Amino acid sequence: MLDRLHLCVITDATLVPGRDHVAIAQAALSAGADMIQLRDKTSDLRTLLAQARAVQALCRSSGAVFIVNDRLDLALASDADGVHVGQDDLPVEAARRLLGPGRILGVSTHERNQAEEAQARGADYIGFGPMFRTGTKDTGYTPRGLNMLREIRAAVSLPILAIGGITLENVVEVIAAGATAPAVISAIVAAPDVAAATAAFRERVALAKNLGQSGQVPRWDP
């Protein structure tokens, strides 16, 4: 399932006033997103739980994967498909133990050793980045770039979600460099039309995957 992903949309309710997690997820799912990750560092748990349950219902009806960023308690309470943890969050082994074997565990990585450790400790997929410059999330790391993504792809067998500064102009080369799928925040969530932006990304990723299977080197020339 995870190795067939095309597009993860990470919800951020702070980017556009009045556009909450549910509205973002509904629009993205209608246009082909096959993973939604709910990311919220500020809202109270009661509000988040109501929105997470609504997003999970939307994902289930669409056959998409629902992941909660950081908050294991919220993931379990909302019956999410899994949780995504960062390098400074709950350790991978502890997250896996609490999450159980039947749910998905994703781990943010920025270096080869982190990716290898995440795989060894039981992650189901890794996030890798930031690929390029981004103003959405400050990881403390400089952009990793395509060459490091190729290195990570050669080092681990897990699905890789590439994140950070990914746009329609560079997503094809990101897939060609070894990413399973992009994880996109601002290029979709802050777009004038979330569904249209999602559809454009989905089409571009499908193009990259098809070209890769045919042995061609996918490049996008805008």
Stretch-by-stretch model annotation:
Residues 1-89, 97-125, 141-144, 151-158, ...:
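Conserved N-terminal beta1-alpha1 strand-loop-helix module at the mouth
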Residues 128, 161-166, 182-186:
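Glycine-rich beta-strand-to-loop/alpha-helix junction loops that act as flexible
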Residues 37-41, 134, 183:
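A short, mixed-charge helix-start or loop-turn motif at secondary-structure junctions
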Residues 137-138:
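Glycine/threonine-rich flexible loop motifs
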Residues 130, 178:
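Short, small-residue-rich loop/turn micro-motifs
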Residues 13, 132-134:
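A short, flexible beta-alpha/helix-coil linker loop
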